[in-house]
From Swiss-Prot:
Binding-site list for AMP: G169, S195, R196, A197, I198, T199, T200, T204, S265, K289
Record SUPFAM superfamilies: Nucleoside phosphorylase/phosphoribosyltransferase catalytic domain, Nucleoside phosphorylase/phosphoribosyltransferase N-terminal domain, Pyrimidine nucleoside phosphorylase C-terminal domain
Role, per record: Catalyzes the conversion of AMP and phosphate to adenine and ribose 1,5-bisphosphate (R15P). Exhibits phosphorylase activity toward CMP and UMP in addition to AMP. Functions in an archaeal AMP degradation pathway, together with R15P isomerase and RubisCO.
Protein name: AMP phosphorylase 2
UniProt-listed SMART domains: PYNP_C
Taxonomic classification: Archaea, Methanobacteriati, Methanobacteriota, Archaeoglobi, Archaeoglobales
Catalysis performed (reactions): AMP + phosphate = alpha-D-ribose 1,5-bisphosphate + adenine; CMP + phosphate = cytosine + alpha-D-ribose 1,5-bisphosphate; UMP + phosphate = alpha-D-ribose 1,5-bisphosphate + uracil
Length: 505
């Protein structure tokens, strides 16, 4: 049947068409069914929605996302026919029943996700199947190969190309913004691509976006990397491993990150960016994505083995995931703290981790036998900050930006300690929730500043954290979460005292 396109003032991040009830019945369609939409020699697969109020017979409604993605306008006349359920759904059902994927099956699933053939519900089933049943290393390797095959790739004709990545989940984990320019200052090429926030209040791309443009194409990434030594860009616009961003979007809704998917996400992006040497950060902690050292070692060994099979040299580092890295959580707050570190105004664990990860790459590539010391020498010479400013300028930012120039939310609230002792535990999930409720990462100036970290002494009335927001109502909501979640556990050296049959806390 032929239909005239009608654009609707809606935006959903999926490919869909809206048909009238009569037209849907004529085609034998129900909500959620698929159709093939053809016009001008092109075609795409879309989900069906049905509306009797907004769409007349003979019209096919599309939201702005579908119109932009598929180059549709109201002048378009399209042909719509039912589209059969893809074979990839059968393969997902097979995994749910406990079977192992074949190479061609995982390739078909990833292809279907990349081309928007699978619905969000079916992608959810894929995620749940791999979370519940798990995946063997060869299945993960096939998934990575399929993700890279259908996407863009950066190809460098010269130089040693390296990269770094964290599996995420840790608030404030912005070591890349310091480590990347340190590595680039040593003469290595580092085309760093990263995701936006998934479970935290800011991803690497969100923080870098405060200072520079992160929406770069593959050609721009190559050009800037060859010009100044590195970039820090958002992965999605590059077209590298396009299935990854689509899987991540659904994982976020499910609040799930299956470990096989973490491995595939990281290594597919690194392969697509042209890297040959990769350093992987694996935060370990009770509320982190990897809960203990034993699980972390297994995760690290699997990543190194899969990397080796993909001709990718991978080194891993198990790092402290029990508390935030640095003290700032949220895009602008983190950007300001990164600049404060590079301007030599503050030190601490953010700097130490940044130099440690950079040092791993220096040792992998033979630049130094003691990578950490080499990284520190570069940092203390001022070359890290100098190179960072070059990267910011190359990505369209202000190369003279200073920490005090970074604007943060003007609505604030400080939570104070009600008792004395020392910080015994910090709930990173609670801090993430407080910062996100305050508006991060969408509101760049929103987030949390942590005044006290583990092991630090606390007196009654001492500030524990300050919430920043751009909107008063979001600040109020974040305060409510902060008062409910109890992100800090404070105790004395004596946790409880027992005397004559009674307990005292």
């Amino acid at each position: 049947m032929k239909f005239r396109i009608k654009t609707l003032p809606l935006r959903t991040e999926r490919i869909a068409v809206v048909l009238s009830q009569d037209d849907a019945a004529e085609l034998g369609l129900l909500p959620g069914d698929r159709v093939k939409v053809s016009y001008d020699g092109k075609s795409f697969v879309a989900e069906v929605e049905i509306s009797q109020e907004f769409i007349s017979s003979g019209e096919a409604g599309v939201c702005t996302f579908t119109a932009e993605t598929c180059s549709l306008s109201e002048e378009c006349v399209v042909e719509i026919v039912p589209f059969a359920r893809p074979k990839s759904v059968e393969y997902i059902r097979k995994k749910l029943n406990g079977a192992k994927y074949e190479r061609e099956e995982i390739k078909d699933i990833i292809g279907s996700i990349s081309s928007d053939v699978l619905s969000d519900i079916e992608i959810s089933a894929f995620i749940l199947a791999n979370e519940i049943v798990g995946m063997q290393n060869d299945e993960i390797q096939w998934m990575i190969e399929a993700m890279v095959e259908v996407g863009e790739r950066v190809v460098f004709e010269r130089g040693t190309v390296v990269d770094m990545h964290s599996i995420g989940g840790l608030p404030g984990n912005r070591f890349s913004l310091i480590a990347v320019p340190t590595v680039a200052a040593a003469g290595l090429l580092i085309p760093k691509t990263a995701s936006r926030a998934i479970t935290t209040a800011s991803g690497t791309a969100d923080t870098m976006e405060v200072l520079a443009n992160v929406n770069l194409s593959v050609d721009e990434i190559k050009e800037i990397t060859e010009e100044v030594g590195g970039v820090i860009a958002w992965n999605a616009p590059t077209g590298i491993a396009p299935a990854d961003e689509k899987i991540i979007r659904v994982e976020y809704q499910l609040e799930l990150s299956p470990k096989p998917h973490l491995m595939a996400s990281v290594l597919s992006k690194k392969l697509g960016s042209g890297a040959r040497f990769v350093a992987i950060d694996i935060p370990v902690g009770k509320k982190a994505k990897v809960e203990n050292v034993d699980v972390g070692r297994g995760f690290a060994n699997a990543m190194m083995e899969i990397g080796r099979n993909l001709n990718l040299k991978v080194a891993t580092a198990l790092t402290d995931g029990s508390q935030p890295l640095g003290r700032a959580i949220g895009p602008a707050l983190e950007a300001r703290e990164v600049l404060e570190v590079m301007e030599r105004k503050v030190e601490g664990d953010l700097l130490e981790k940044s130099l440690g990860i950079a040092g791993i790459l220096f040792e992998m590539t033979g630049i130094a036998t003691n990578g950490y010391q080499h990284a520190r020498k570069i940092f203390e010479s001022g070359k890290t900050l100098e190179k960072f400013r070059e990267i910011v300028a190359a990505q369209g930012g202000d190369e003279s930006v200073k920490a005090e120039d970074v604007a943060v939310g003007d609505k604030t609230y400080t939570l104070h300690a009600a008792k004395e002792g020392y910080v015994r535990e910090i709930d990173i999930a609670a801090l993430n929730e407080i910062a996100r409720t305050a508006g991060a990462p969408k509101d760049k100036g929103a987030g949390v500043y942590v005044h006290k970290k583990r092991g630090e002494v606390v007196k009654v009335g001492d500030p524990l954290l300050t919430i920043y927001a751009e909107k008063e109502w979001k600040l109020d909501n974040a305060i409510e979460v902060a008062n409910t979640k109890q992100a800090f556990e404070i105790s004395g050296v004596i946790i409880e005292r027992y005397t004559m049959g009674r307990w005292w806390s």
